[in-house]
Amino acid sequence: MNILITTGIFPPDVGGPAKFVPLMADSLSKNHVLNVITLSEETYSVDEFEYGIFRIKRNQNKIFRFLKTVMLIIRKGRNVNIIFINGLWLEVYIANLFLRKKTIRKIVGDPVWEKLYTQYKIDDNFDQFQQKKYTLKIELLKFLRNFTLKSSNTIVVPSKHLMDFVKNLGFKGSLLQINNGTEITESKKTNKDSYEFLIVSRLVRQKNIDIVLKSLSLVKEKYSIDFQLNIVGEGPEYKNLIGLIEQLNLIENVKLVGAKHSEELHHFY
């Protein structure tokens, strides 16, 4: 089988899709022809993978980038049997008007809500956003979301909440719930005088890292506990979190250590 995967991020970028897509691609490429199209901070002449990686530079004119991505999907999708959409959903929809290929789409949230919420253009939570009416521009984005989603042949979600979300949008195709997996490691008993916490996450508003910091600040003040929190990741909330850490007087307790990969990340566990 010939498979094309589209994603918004891929190593060396850090984030959920950048972890999931290579794992899936590594497995599928053993028995199938496979290519990946991704946005990237930089383009690389050589990628150390057993399948094709086609990178489009993220930081460029958005209209030009969109058109370039659509054309690349059309070019690389002509001979594929199926397109797995882990990102670039609107670009795939436009390209597939010409390609007419079967598609499987992974839904892990509402991309329209996430974008608006991350940019502080709305304050409503996920479920409120589905019920309320907004400006014409936002309603148009929701319409495009719904229309493109319903064009998929199969949708995969990691939770019942998201399954209900997809059903409520009127999707009539094949819908599968596959819960997120995790790496099982050997547990070790330790006796420590202090509490150590770890957050591994993209630094975006919807992750609610600010609530964790405020909660730990209250616990520290009430119970006088000593703790250390390492936050691994990068993203647009970095400066806001730095300011909050200073405001809550947690400079000695909380460290933003940036993005870490593989062995570097294991060190924090």
Question: How does the language model describe each region?
Answer:
Residues 240-260:
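Nucleotide-activated donor-binding/catalytic signature segment of Leloir-type glycosyltransferases, i.e.
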Residues 4, 156, 189-207, 212-218, ...:
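Conserved donor-binding/catalytic core segment of Leloir-type glycosyltransferases
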Residues 85-91, 107:
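Short His-centered aromatic/hydrophobic patch
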Residues 161, 181:
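Carbohydrate-associated surface elements
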Residues 70-78, 127-155:
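Membrane-proximal helix-turn-helix segments that form the acceptor-binding/catalytic region
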Residues 104-143:
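Acceptor-binding helix/loop patch of EC 2.4 sugar-transfer enzymes
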Residues 77, 149, 259-260, 267-269:
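Short alpha-helical donor nucleotide-sugar binding micro-motif in glycosyltransferases
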Residues 7-14, 20-64:
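N-terminal strand-loop element at the rim of the active site
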